[in-house]
């Protein structure tokens, strides 16, 4: 249940966030897609931990492919 709610909130962010913010991600997949993949693969707690760590790394000049 927590995973589904989290994924729905992330998808809401993906639809409502300004284009400038959404296009700023330097990683592939995007940080929000990475969070969804991590939640689906590793569950709520570990998935969010991985997603938050990824967001912390999302600073210039970092970037490139980074899969969960």
Swiss-Prot record:
Domain of life: Viruses
A Pfam short name: YidD
InterPro entries associated with the record: Membr_insert_effic_factor_YidD
NCBIfam families, per the entry: membrane protein insertion efficiency factor YidD
Entries under PANTHER family matching the protein: MEMBRANE PROTEIN INSERTION EFFICIENCY FACTOR-RELATED
Protein family: To bacterial proteins yidD.
Name the UniProt record assigns to this protein: Uncharacterized 7.9 kDa protein in int-C1 intergenic region
Lineage summary: Viruses, Duplodnaviria, Heunggongvirae, Uroviricota, Caudoviricetes
């Amino acid at each position: 249940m927590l995973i589904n709610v989290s994924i729905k909130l992330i998808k809401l962010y993906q639809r409502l966030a300004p284009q400038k913010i959404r296009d700023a991600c330097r990683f592939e997949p995007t940080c929000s897609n990475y969070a969804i993949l991590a939640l689906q693969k590793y569950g709520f707690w570990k998935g969010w931990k991985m997603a938050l760590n990824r967001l912390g790394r999302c600073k210039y000049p970092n970037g490139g492919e980074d899969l969960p």
